[in-house]
Amino acid sequence: MLWVEKYRPKTLEEVVADKSIITRVIKWAKSWKRGSKPLLLAGPPGVGKTSLALALANTMGWEAVELNASDQRSWRVIERIVGEGAFNETISDEGEFLSSRIGKLKLIILDEVDNIHKKEDVGGEAALIRLIKRKPAQPLILIANDPYKLSPELRNLCEMINFKRLTKQQVARVLERIALKEGIKVDKSVLLKIAENAGGDLRAAINDFQALAEGKEELKPEDVFLTKRTQEKDIFRVMQMIFKTKNPAVYNEAMLLDESPEDVIHWVDENLPLEYSGVELVNAYEALSRADIFLGRVRRRQFYRLWKYASYLMTVGVQQMKEEPKKGFTRYRRPAVWQMLFQLRQKREMTRKILEKIGKYSHLSMRKARTEMFPVIKLLLKELDVDKAATIAAFYEFTKEELEFLVGEKGDEIWKYVEKHGMHRIEDETFLESFVKAEKEEKEESVEEVAEEKPEEEREEPRARKKAGKNLTLDSFFS
């Protein structure tokens, strides 16, 4: 079991933080009522923000519901889960929120909230702001490493508490308590060295301490070879440890990665067939599938403590399924699924931009733009001549990339025509007006060309007929 979880504080007294922070948090919790501002706990990683929130829930007798913003990329998902959790009273075993007359308060903890401000999370912050303005009936704590990635509006809606990096003495005291409980003999200078290398990150220090002390009854100064903690361990090195060794310490190495278990399982899945075959491959995939089951439970129930079981199965579980490591160099590959997901994300983003233009200039909702106009416009661009298709492209102000996305190579031809003729959209002109206007201009040009080729007397005849027929009714044209 990871020591980070094993020795996570259960009460506020066990949390390593300034007394002023603990006092403010207790005051907020005891005075909380519907409409109270959420707490925004801000500070660098490993200073106890999440631990404090969980300890607060335990102290107050509240049920803690943990969400991780970096793993719930869709703002709709965040709004559904946080919204339902904030406005209902109980949670089922399957992780679904249920309405109930009897139930205790739930402390909703949204971690890594500064990550929903990225491009792939468009709308996430807006959804959160809407939720807070609705005055949820449950206490809400937001956690961020960098609060200034959030908009001023969101920060102003919260009561912000800033955490400072822990001193190496504070970190060393925690490590000393863990060493005592684990029965490990260790000099205080060694603990101070580990604490210094962690740079004020208590979680990192505990992970380093566990990795160094694994299987030892005593930790000596010469065992601490760290010069500076590597913040981002090499994923390729972890792959080598899984496939080329039978050392169970790979689990600790994997937990130090700046990769989530969802990322690591893709790496293992991609490279497993390069190293294993036959029965070994079957057994390794069995371990990997069990890891995936735990990850699925994490996604459904938002219970991130199950990550450790998934991580163990995808590293040590897969590693121990081989009789002997395969010799020789293996070039490990990045997960192919990432490229596919990236392409799908690009496709969705391009479609969204096109639909926004169609909706804007056709005065339609996004839904109607998608279901009614998008297929028609795509067909017209494909089937019409380049000059007519260019009229549509100019009207909707499609870019070259958007045209190529819609009709492939023809999109480049359409774009060149638009550029060559300086075509642009006329404000307040409807699509039908624009298209009819282009058709009319083309017919007039055609009539003028034909007229120039006719003799003078033939050109005069239509004018006389037009003059004589000014007062004729419509029926007279067919008599």
UniProtKB/Swiss-Prot annotation:
SUPFAM superfamilies: P-loop containing nucleoside triphosphate hydrolases (SSF52540). Transmembrane segments: none annotated. Keywords: ATP-binding, DNA replication, Nucleotide-binding. Coiled coil: none annotated. Residues 452-463 have a biased composition (Basic and acidic residues). Residues 441-479 are annotated as: Disordered. Belongs to the activator 1 small subunits family. RfcL subfamily. Heteropentamer composed of four small subunits (RfcS) and one large subunit (RfcL). Both subunits interact with PCNA. This is Replication factor C large subunit. It comes from Archaeoglobus fulgidus (strain ATCC 49558 / DSM 4304 / JCM 9628 / NBRC 100126 / VC-16). The gene is rfcL.
